[in-house]
Amino acid sequence: NFHNVWYRGTVEFRWFEGTLHAGKVKSYVQFVLALAAKGLNGRAASSRKREFKPESAKYDFRVFLLHLGLIGDEFKTARKPLLSAMPGDAAFKRGRPQPKPQTTEMANVTVLEG
């Protein structure tokens, strides 16, 4: 809501649902503060629109949060509620890789009995 910029000199972010959970409120506040700091201190912004890919949405948002400076154990509790409802895997861009099947070659093994 940019009307408050002219009346009160503030900006409102009406993105979040109301909650009384202290951890969620803290994570929302930290996210908005980091976003505002990036907007004030950023040197450039990209106007290129990216397409939404559900399989990498959580990973992309996690990387964005890290880019905002929400890095480390002190912001772990801030990242968790923001990423919890997103689809995809936070650790892998193209989904968790499938393990390769292990082949056992027992035909060439000779058993020695002693």
What are the residue ranges of the model-derived segments?
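C-terminal accessory/tail domains of diverse enzymes
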Residues: 1-114
